[in-house]
């Protein structure tokens, strides 16, 4: 009995090992002659050499784990459609229900439209780490897939993430750290990613625009997508509804900011906003709901509380959560008129001043702007 069990375990082990295959493709277009996918799913396949769109499409729904790191993608024309070299072809794995892991080719410069759209392999993961020449991720490249994470760290050649590129996936973490050439996040690029818990934009120094609804509904299921820190970016404009209904705790805006468009933060759950430019941006209609604006904690540059209060249209008690980097506020103390006149105030030199003094004063141990 023990011998039978040992033989069975050995057979199972050998069967598992047999499923890991490495194939070198000398001539692009010849994969069919090297790998038989008839009525089978390959657990683990590594390709090397040269392949084209037909080779890759041939593997659709037939491979669980695919390593293309050392593959070169060759140009191919199918009908009247040209599939360029060094580009992950449009729609090549669209609707794949088996693929759960892929290591992308190191030489690609672009991921085509819908390349991995609706890939539903269990816990789908993509390794971008070797893609040092990647410049563009096209429309819907990974949309509506089971993708678990977007880790584009260190991809210094990446310039554009197009519309709907990562729309409605299962991603929990977005990291663009070190994407120093990234210029644009397209319309709905990360929209409806309900499970996100963190977003890393550190080092995205060239980022200029965040598209319409780019982060709409982010973190809706996780209830906390953390902090959206745009401070190192060069963003001048947040498009309409770009952060609408997002479940982020804190948003830090860059010093380059000029415009926050209509409904950019409408229905957002943000509890903290921080602005870095001395000049308030232009705010579009309902950029944030009136009630939320009165309750969110807002930090602005030193000495700029009044300018921002005017830009927000806040005054009196409605501005109680607005303060500058030094803690100075508009002086909303919620005290009676009778006691207000007797309130002791001191300037920054420690000298007592009267009610007519204008500038930063100390009241009740707090800095306020008069």
Per-region residue spans from a language model:
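A recurrent domain-boundary module in secreted/ectodomain proteins
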Residues: 307-331
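Sec-dependent N-terminal signal peptides
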Residues: 5-14
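Consensus positions within tandem repeat domains that build extended binding/scaffold surfaces
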Residues: 90-92, 112-115, 138-141, 162-165, ...
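Residue-level detector of functionally pivotal "anchor" positions at catalytic/ligand-binding pockets or at interdomain
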Residues: 326-349
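Sec/Tat signal peptide C-region and signal peptidase I cleavage site
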Residues: 14-20
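Terminal processing/anchoring signals of secreted or surface-associated proteins
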Residues: 45, 308, 331-332, 350, ...
